[in-house]
Curated annotation (Swiss-Prot):
HAMAP family: Ribosomal_bL31_2. One of its GO terms (biological process) is translation. One of its GO terms (cellular component) is ribosome. Belongs to the bacterial ribosomal protein bL31 family. Type B subfamily. Part of the 50S ribosomal subunit. This is Large ribosomal subunit protein bL31B. It comes from the Bacteria. One of its GO terms (molecular function) is structural constituent of ribosome. Coiled coil: none annotated. It comes from Corynebacterium urealyticum (strain ATCC 43042 / DSM 7109). Keywords: Ribonucleoprotein, Ribosomal protein.
Amino acid sequence: MKKDIHPDYHPVVFKDSATGKQFLTRSTATSDRTVEWEDGNEYPLIVVDITSESHPFWTGAQRVMDTAGRVEKFQRRYGGMARRKKKTQ
């Protein structure tokens, strides 16, 4: 590998905002927030919406995630289209 062309790859803690579960892994992601891990070291903390702990594919539970009203916005824009098409047919 060439030197000094690859991003910094370091330990990072990812936290699932839905379940609170935390994972220590390696990533190029950075954060100003830190958390003390079980080994006593501090690592950057990245908070994410979905992980394998909360994703419907892995949990088997279906749920609708509404991030900043996106579902309602979609329903307002396109929700009536299905009803309108049925009336014209």
